[in-house]
Amino acid sequence: MRIVLLGPPGAGKGTQAKMLCEEYHIPQLSTGDMLREVIRRETEIGKKAKAMINAGTLVSDSIVNQIVSDRIDESDCINGFVLDGYPRTVGQAEVLQQVLQSKNMQLDAVIELIVDEDALLERMKKRVQETIIAGGQVRSDDNPVAFAKRLVEYREKTAPLSEFYLQRRLLKLVDGMIGVTEVSRKIREVLK
């Protein structure tokens, strides 16, 4: 099962990705985790990514695309994967499609979690409170101003992916406002 999870920040993509991975025994491919791993291993592409990050610039699409392509080649992805946080743009989606075709693979589904933006802000605030209570580190972008910027960026860059995947008959919409377990059940239903 090869799945892409879409949805705005705070929609629960990471939570649902973990549940799908447990159910289907496939890895979660998070761009953040993959970037950290290639940097930690000091691979050639990891060195390039680290240089961009150290220079204060976004890691280029070409590097992110290569990291994802290389990760899909690893043996634990043979039976599938859940992509979380990638693709973020139609350009990345087009590259992903080409990469998968070159490997004789294709996506099985693209799940978009539909969530009310006001509710997302409340979720973010709750996550901050829970993290503080647990003595954890609060993400630097977990504040209302940064969160609003992330939502704008999502609407401008990532939301157009819905139409891209709808045209390819891969898009499945799931209400992300219901409970975590119920969202998971709905996802399993649309994957059948």
From Swiss-Prot:
Positions bound to ATP = G10, A11, G12, K13, G14, T15, R127, I178
Q: In which pathway does it act?
A: Purine metabolism; AMP biosynthesis via salvage pathway; AMP from ADP: step 1/1
Q: Name one GO cellular component term.
A: cytoplasm
What cystine linkages occur within this chain? none
> Does the keyword section mention Ribonucleoprotein?
no
Keyword Nucleotide-binding attached: yes
Q: Which SUPFAM superfamilies does the record associate with it? A: P-loop containing nucleoside triphosphate hydrolases (SSF52540)
Q: Where is this region: NMP?
A: 30-59
Reaction catalysed by this chain?
A: AMP + ATP = 2 ADP
> Which residues does the annotated region (LID) include?
126-142
Residues recorded as binding AMP, renumbered to this chain, are T31, R36, T57, L58, V59, G85, Y86, P87, R88, Q92, R139, R150
Localization of this protein: Cytoplasm
Q: Enumerate the Gene Ontology biological process terms.
A: AMP salvage
Q: What is its EC number?
A: 2.7.4.3
Molecular function per GO? adenylate kinase activity; ATP binding
Could you list this entry's UniProt keywords, alphabetically sorted.
ATP-binding, Cytoplasm, Kinase, Nucleotide biosynthesis, Nucleotide-binding, Transferase
Q: What is its main location?
A: cytoplasm
The annotated subunit structure for this chain is: Monomer.
Function, in words: Catalyzes the reversible transfer of the terminal phosphate group between ATP and AMP. Plays an important role in cellular energy homeostasis and in adenine nucleotide metabolism.
Family designation: Belongs to the adenylate kinase family.
Domains (record comment): Consists of three domains, a large central CORE domain and two small peripheral domains, NMPbind and LID, which undergo movements during catalysis. The LID domain closes over the site of phosphoryl transfer upon ATP binding. Assembling and dissambling the active center during each catalytic cycle provides an effective means to prevent ATP hydrolysis.
Q: What is this protein called?
A: Adenylate kinase
Q: What organism is the protein native to?
A: Bartonella henselae (strain ATCC 49882 / DSM 28221 / CCUG 30454 / Houston 1)
* Gene assigned in the entry: adk
